Swiss-Prot record:
InterPro entries: PLipase_A2 (IPR001211), PLipase_A2_Asp_AS (IPR033112), PLipase_A2_dom (IPR016090), PLipase_A2_dom_sf (IPR036444), PLipase_A2_His_AS (IPR033113). Homodimer; non-covalently linked. Binds to heparin. GO terms for molecular function: calcium ion binding; calcium-dependent phospholipase A2 activity; heparin binding; phospholipid binding; toxin activity. This is Basic phospholipase A2 homolog 2. It is found in: Secreted. GO terms for biological process: arachidonate secretion; defense response to bacterium; lipid catabolic process; negative regulation of T cell proliferation; phospholipid metabolic process. The record marks L127, L130 as: Hydrophobic membrane-disruption site (MDiS). Heparin inhibits the myotoxic activity. Suramin inhibits the myotoxic activity. High level of membrane cholesterol content reduces cytolytic activity, whereas low level of membrane cholesterol content increases cytolytic activity. Coiled coil: none annotated. The keyword Disulfide bond applies. Cytolytic activity upon C2C12 cells is completely abolished at 15 degrees Celsius or below. Residues 121-133 are annotated as: Important for membrane-damaging activities in eukaryotes and bacteria. Keywords: Antibiotic, Antimicrobial, Blood coagulation cascade inhibiting toxin, Disulfide bond, Hemostasis impairing toxin, Heparin-binding, Lipoprotein, Myotoxin, Pharmaceutical, Secreted, Signal, Toxin.
């Protein structure tokens, strides 16, 4: 409960699905999303882009590609609902755009959990100018 409260404090003022994304990451990984992934590697975080540094960073790269494929919705502002049932994220929207947005966020949260063993603290606050150009999605 304390971790959830800390995450909420760190994400105060965050718009749209970013809040839901943060909750999903916390639920799947047990890590504070802002601290652990807010500026991780070349792709995690709002300003991230570039060739992924490791499998964790690749999760964020694929997530950005997923967002780019969305049509008619704004990942930073649109809000969706989901539930956490039996340690599984269940997207609950009838609106196709919001459902796809939720599925993008669900996929990255699961990917980050599946790649916890690749998480490297040296990439936690990686300098973006050191990132090389990535292939197009």
């Amino acid at each position: 409960m304390r971790t959830l409260w800390i995450m909420a404090v760190l994400l105060v003022g965050v718009e749209g699905s970013l809040f839901e994304l943060g909750k999903m990451i916390l639920q799947e990984t047990g890590k504070n999303p802002a601290k652990s992934y807010g500026a991780y590697g070349c792709n995690c975080g709002v300003l991230g882009r570039g060739k992924p540094k490791d499998a964790t960073d690749r999760c964020c790269y694929v997530h950005k590609c997923c967002y780019k494929k969305l049509t008619g919705c704004n990942p930073k502002k649109d809000r969706y609902s989901y539930s956490w049932k039996d340690k599984t994220i269940v997207c609950g929207e009838n609106n196709s755009c919001l459902k796809e947005l939720c599925e993008c966020d669900k996929a990255v949260a699961i990917c980050l959990r599946e790649n916890l063993n690749t998480y490297n603290k040296k990439y936690r606050y990686y300098l973006k100018p050191l990132c090389k150009k990535a292939d197009a999605c």
